[in-house]
Curated annotation (Swiss-Prot):
UniProt xrefs under PROSITE patterns: PUR_PYR_PR_TRANSFER
CDD domains (alphabetical): PRTases_typeI (cd06223)
PANTHER family assigned: ADENINE PHOSPHORIBOSYLTRANSFERASE
An MF annotation (GO) of this entry: AMP binding
Localization: Cytoplasm
Name the UniProt record assigns to this protein: Adenine phosphoribosyltransferase
Keyword flag Transferase: yes
Similarity comment: Belongs to the purine/pyrimidine phosphoribosyltransferase family.
Main location per the UniProt record: cytoplasm
Amino acid sequence: MDKNTTSELAASIRSIPDYPKPGIIFRDITTLLGNPRAFRRAVDELVQPYAGTKIDKIAGMEARGFILGGAVAHQLSSGFVPIRKKGKLPHETVRIAYSLEYGVDEMEMHRDAVQPGEKVILVDDLIATGGTAVGATKLLRQIGAEVVGACFVIDLPDLGGRKKLEELGVVVHTLVEFSGH
């Protein structure tokens, strides 16, 4: 990805200081999603490393990962799998507990959403500490999926999430980096 595209995408992301608490800068992609050119470029760049590769499913993490993941799945002619918070899916699920910055939560997916051996890419808007992405990777592997990559619009490298995923053998692709929290 060229520097102009990186700059354009970074400029389309709103930064909100002291949200949700003092000292945090919230990176809001709703402005990127609302800008047709930036949204298209972001999706094109998320898809680029996988062009020409058979990817069976895109797993999008609640909630912004649903928006981006659906678009990525469409472009790659892949199926889409929502990974949701506990209690949000109506059929038989598989579930895993995962670590958050300040506690533990659970995520789940339909048990039959991915078949053993299928190649899956994780998609979300942002990787920070990596708790959600690591949990999703473990959940998918628990049912036999091959997690071949993870892509995010934003990386907050100071928080170490990318490194945690890479330590699990997941190739990580991001578009924009922001320092700090």
